[in-house]
């Protein structure tokens, strides 16, 4: 199979309905094991709206962390205030330093918007990091590679990702199992560490312990330029 077959399909801005329903259930059952604190900007706990001109960048930052040593990831979910949150857009946060993460978005049309934050344990990123350390130390075993195949199976069963990702995951699992049948540890390892697989599992992997910031923050998109937008984060 060509590596192009593993490329995740271009995701739509909005979550798919099937994905949204599944994640809505996860929100309801979430243990909130990933903490989301110190969200900025937010005025009086969300009582007043942040103001931005259309097209003007809005940088959101937060402290995001969890217990243990697992890798985590997070995303800003945002959209028109009158739109079902399951249809909001999603933008991945970037790690800054310590527990601080941030992301920058903008709004194309004037009007009321809202945003919130979701975060989860990224078991694939955790596996990738730990497997590299073990391989570098000459201690990689079949157990780590069995775990890798299980991650791919769970991703395939999750229903996440854009159309076509499930087919790519099935082909990935087929390749991994062929390497395993030949006892080819290096083939499995190299495939799971490839950029194509990383992108695929970022798009379609399981979001373990999916947690959500309680509530959502209002944003008002002004038409044209807002010369005193910095003040709008301090005063209603």
Q: Can you say where each PLM-predicted feature lies in the sequence?
A:
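N-terminal structural segment of carbohydrate-active enzymes
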Residues: 2-35, 41, 53-82, 87-236
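Short, solvent-exposed beta-strand/turn "edge" segments of beta-rich domains on protein surfaces
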Residues: 47-53
